[in-house]
């Protein structure tokens, strides 16, 4: 079997079938005056994404009540974040989270529904590929400022190999990312 046909034999699922996704809803929006320079609860925004990760040195913080306001946007290691406003479709994988964290508006928090059958790292790698951006550009709404709607994102098709294969694919792609980062430093 050649490489071009591999994904054809994998199960095809919709993103909404394999992941839960949540974002800060309108009435919960934070005012800039609520952004703190230090604290116990980090606030992650799309501008904190750097090369598929969160740059924790640039984040703001919020009060405990704003963190506790919505458990569905409290992020954890293994969460996948996708920007939905402005520069849409940027993807970050959460790891090495140093403290409790929540999201600002403009970012989806994705968590896999079944972590026995779906690898969050595999899903992250697939989402950061060109397929999501292509899909987003075809499906996004708005004029000069685009917006990615959740009802569109849930329809995004995901080729899903068996879990063991997902681990192999994500390990391979993670190693490539590490090599790219290493070469960019030199």
Residue ranges and their predicted role:
Residues 1-14, 160-186:
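Amphipathic alpha-helical coiled-coil/heptad-repeat segments
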Residues 3-26, 155:
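Non-catalytic DNA-recognition/assembly elements of restriction-modification systems
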Residues 4-9, 109-119, 133-134, 151-167:
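Proline-centric
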Residues 13-18, 47, 105, 130, ...:
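Structural detector for helix-capping/boundary residues
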Residues 16-19, 31-66, 110:
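DNA target-recognition patches
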Residues 28-34, 138-140:
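Short coil/turn segments at secondary-structure boundaries
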Residues 45-46, 57-130:
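A short beta-sheet element
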Residues 84, 100-108, 141-164:
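A short glycine-rich beta-alpha junction/loop motif
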């Amino acid at each position: 079997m050649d490489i071009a046909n591999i994904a054809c034999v994998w199960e095809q699922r919709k993103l909404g079938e394999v992941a839960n996704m949540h974002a800060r809803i309108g009435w919960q929006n934070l005012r800039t005056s609520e952004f703190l320079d230090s604290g116990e609860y980090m606030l992650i925004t799309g501008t904190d994404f750097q090369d598929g990760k969160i740059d924790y040195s640039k984040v703001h913080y919020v009060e405990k009540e704003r963190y506790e306001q919505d458990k569905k946007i409290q992020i954890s290691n293994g969460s996948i974040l996708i920007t939905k406003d402005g520069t849409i479709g940027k993807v970050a994988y959460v790891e090495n989270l140093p403290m409790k964290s929540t999201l600002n508006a403009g970012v989806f928090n994705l968590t896999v529904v079944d972590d026995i059958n779906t690898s969050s790292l595999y899903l992250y790698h697939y989402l950061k590929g060109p397929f999501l951006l292509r899909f987003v550009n075809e499906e996004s709404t708005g004029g000069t400022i685009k917006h990615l709607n959740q009802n569109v994102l849930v329809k995004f098709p995901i080729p899903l190999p068996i879990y063991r294969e997902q681990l192999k694919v994500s390990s391979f792609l993670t190693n490539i990312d590490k090599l790219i980062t290493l070469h960019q430093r030199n």
